[in-house]
Amino acid sequence: WPIRYADLEPWYSYVEKFVGICGDRDGIENLPDSEVMPGFALNCVEKHIQEANHRRYQLQRRVIIGRCAHLTQPQDIHLQQGRGQCQNRTLCERGCPYGGYFSSVSSTIPWANKTGNLTLIPNAVVHSIIYDDTLGKATGVRVIDALTNQSTEYHAKIIFVNAATLNTNLILLNSTSGRFPKGLGNDHDILGHYIAFHNYRGNVSAIHEDYKDQYYYGRRPTQVFIPSFRNVFKKETDFQGGYMSYYVAYRPGWHKGYGRQGIGE
C-alpha cells in the first residue's frame, strides 16, 4: 500500500474511541493494540488452555480474549450517542436496544443525523459506481428503487463502499466504464476471485475432566482466540496466508443428551 501504518494509526484510534472497543492491549506485532475498554474474562478452562499454550509455544502463538465493539465501560462519547453498557445477554443478532454494541443503527446514523446534513433513502439498491473517464475518478453511485425499479444517480466527492464481502465485489464488477470494462479496479481480473469466509466446519471439540469444582456465571459476547501465526513474518508453508482460531470452554447443559445414542429408545 502507498501508505504506512503510522499514517493510519491516529485514524484507527479516532474510530476505535468513537466505536468503543473492549479487549486487552496484548502487544502482538501483527495485531496492533487498540484503544480499548476492559475486556471480558476467561473462565478457568480457557485460562488453563491459555497457560498450556504459552508454555508450549511461548510468544509464538498467543491466546487472548477477543476484541469486540461492545461497551464494557461507556465513555462520554458513547453516552452522547445514546448508547449504554453491554448487558452480556448475547442476543446481539436481534439488535441491541441498549446500543451496547456498535452498529450504524445505534451509533453512526443517529450521530450523522444530528448534523442536519444526513439524507436517508429507503429501498435503494446500489447497482454500480459511476466512473468518469475524463476526470479519472469515481463521481457517484447508481441505485435502483426496490419497489419501482426506477434508476437514480447520486453524485458525491467521496464514496464509501461498505457492502461486505460478496456485494462489494458485485458492485465493483457492475461498475464498468471505458477505463474499467471488466469492473472498477479490475485490471487483473481478480475481482470475484479468492473470496474467503470463516471455516465454520473446521472445528474440533474435547471434554476436559478437571475443574468440576468450579463454575462460571454470566454470558459473554466474544470468544478467546489465537491471532494468525502462520506465514506472518516469513513463508513457512507452500501456501499464502495463515489461520486465526477461536475457541470457547463451557459446561454443557441437559440438552447435551440430544446427540447421544439411547435417547428416545
What residue ranges belong to the model's regions?
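Helix N-terminus capping/helix-initiation residues
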Residues: 43, 145, 232-234
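FAD cofactor-binding and catalytic pocket of flavoenzymes
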Residues: 1-2, 67, 188-265
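A short, glycine/Asx- and small/polar-enriched loop/turn
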Residues: 79-80, 132-139
